[in-house]
Amino acid sequence: MALSTVLALVSALVPFLHLPMGGNFTLASMLPVVVISYMFGVGWGLFAAFTYSVIQIVMDLCMGLSGSVLLPLFLPQSDDYMGAFAAVSILVLDYFVAYSALGLGGVLRDRVKSKTAALVGGALIAVGVRYLVHVLSGYIFYGAWAEWFFSQEGWFQGFGAWLLARLDGGALALVYSFFYNGLYMIPEVVVTALVAVPISRIARIRREEPLKKGN
């Protein structure tokens, strides 16, 4: 179980896309935690996922303080930082809650006959819930960035102008959060599900009964 958590952390250190306001796309870095939940049960999965979230936040904070990555805790067009409550709430939602959701990966093991479908479906649920938590956090705390984001030049400039002409306020903030977080989470969901297919065929993972700690 510890090895799977380490594998997840190592995979997360090699992002293929790192967005400026947080979030990155990796090659199925969350799958080892999902597999823990599938093999040992949701209880141990949630424990491993929470441990993963704690280590992840420490690593990101260290990189942020060293200047390696941007800590997106400031307000648009301003040098002012968010208040302490907002900053702590972001850490709780985007790390503790979002990453802990990966522990739901084993929720379908005893409900779906096909082992492959159970693992793939569990991965989709776990990573999908993480995506929705990030969307909620983005909507609440980063909605102020929506207008700035969609007004930037780039490949989606036309789409951004179209949105800005039709939406504002909370609706624009919600679309922004779905869009921004979807840039890295949707590919992550797809890749995780695809990699889960061959992983589900490994004999030790396909065991009829969940493994007990120490097996």
Pin down the residues of each PLM region.
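Loop-helix junctions at membrane interfaces
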Residues: M1-N215
